[in-house]
Design a protein with these regions (language model features):
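Short, flexible helix-loop junctions that flank or precede catalytic/ligand sites
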Residues: 1-410
Length: 410
């Protein structure tokens, strides 16, 4: 087929058709790029949609522009990139990023279910539910891109919306999960649509009488400083960061500030921090989805002192021994638990661990295991590198990039 014939085939395709194909395949992301067929991410792996030819620059631009308002088109052409979200009735909501590459338009669309998953469906432990009951303080959900942070936060906000009678204010870029008023009033503000920036929204947030504030992402010094201040003034504040461990999250927050302010910030953080959840998605041993490994830090008096005294490196040992009493667990303890519950293979556990020797010792001893921690799926019994009866059922987390060979898209 000639290039002209290929592009003429593509010109009849609509974006809703491609998104429907993606959702039918159980995909999480749709990628549009010139000189490539549309590609979807299924169980964390990219593969071309079967039956579609390579797209031309005019194809990708037409598809991307088909869901933009005039204001969004203007903003994209001015800034050369755009984050936004939208919904397709009867299908799903989608978060999108449109960008320029080599002079042509590219786009990525991520599926966001209308349904918000429950704690039980996500396999979140009881200690996470306790964080939602806090009257004030800072709760952080961290992890790499595509680790399901938005899914976890949406579940936590929904639980608060059901259990409490408060005002929830969210500041997001863009709005992902939609929250209806239940027992709480929920106001969701989108950067560039409802406010100019995270900083601008946070500066006026306290005038809007919130009880709970969600900051979509703490990207810079101003946002971090404002989030700490809001938590300090008696509001329960949720936020995300792209960090890979609990103690690196603390360091990231402190290191953003100038050296002369860091002692003050350590004291401030030691007082307001109520929890850090650092999560990662792993391929399930059954091959039909992913499960979540979750590191949890709950600041007790000793940990608050370590933060204040700049002894962050000692926090890890406190987490290792704080599981039974405080509900904490390290990432290695989470991996060992998932392995013993036959949800992941030994190979995956070792590949994802930053300290394989410690993990091997945990697995061999059978210690440090959290029986209340589900990781987003079922399973149980004695461990096996290749379980004969693996846990079944796909993960409710739609994102992630697991290790393994790329499966074909059927």
């Amino acid at each position: 087929m000639s290039y002209e014939q290929q592009t003429s085939v593509e010109s009849s395709v609509t974006l809703p058709e491609l998104l429907r194909k993606m959702t039918e395949l159980g995909g999480s992301d749709l990628h549009l790029s010139t000189n490539s067929a549309p590609q979807v991410r299924v169980h964390g792996h990219l593969a071309p949609l079967p039956g579609f030819a390579n797209m031309s620059p005019s194809d990708t631009k037409r598809l991307a522009y088909s869901v933009l308002t005039d204001a969004q088109k203007h903003r994209f052409e001015e800034n050369l990139e755009l984050d936004f979200s939208f919904g397709l009735k009867g299908m799903s909501r989608f978060r999108a990023n449109i960008f320029n590459q080599k002079g042509a338009v590219g786009a990525v669309f991520r599926a966001i279910p209308y349904e918000i998953k429950t704690f039980e469906a996500l396999g979140l432990p009881t200690v996470v539910s306790d964080m939602c009951k806090k009257p004030r303080g800072l709760v952080l959900v961290t992890g790499p891109t595509g680790s399901g942070k938005s899914t976890t936060l949406a579940s936590m906000i929904d639980k608060i919306n059901i259990d409490r009678h408060d005002h929830i204010l969210t500041i997001e870029d863009p709005i992902e999960f939609l929250h209806n008023h239940k027992n709480c009033i929920v106001n969701q503000r989108e950067v560039a649509a409802d406010t100019h920036s995270f900083g601008a929204a946070l500066r006026t947030a306290l005038r809007q009488d919130p009880d709970i504030v969600l900051v979509g992402e703490m990207r810079d010094l101003e946002t971090i400083e404002m989030a700490l201040r809001i938590a300090e003034t008696g509001h329960l504040t949720f936020a995300t960061l792209h960090t890979n461990s609990a103690y690196s999250t603390i360091n990231r927050i402190i290191d953003v500030f100038p050296a002369e302010q860091q002692a003050q910030v350590r004291t401030q953080l030691s007082l307001v921090l109520e929890g850090i959840m650092c999560q990662s998605l792993l391929p399930k041993s059954s091959g039909d989805g992913r499960c979540m490994a979750l590191e949890i830090l709950i600041p007790n008096a000793a940990i608050r002192n370590l933060i204040r005294e700049d002894k962050i490196h000692q926090i890890y040992s406190m987490m290792q021994t704080g599981q039974d009493k405080f509900g904490m667990q390290t990432f290695n303890q989470a991996l060992a638990t998932l392995y013993h519950k036959r949800q992941i293979t030994l190979e995956v556990a070792m590949q994802r661990s930053s300290n394989a020797d410690e993990l091997r010792e945990l697995i061999d001893r059978g210690s440090g295991l959290n029986e209340s921690y589900g990781g987003g799926g079922g399973g149980g019994g004695r461990p096996a590198t290749r379980p004969t009866q693996p846990a079944s059922g796909g993960s409710p987390y739609a994102q992630g990039r697991p290790i393994g060979e790329r499966p074909p898209v059927r």
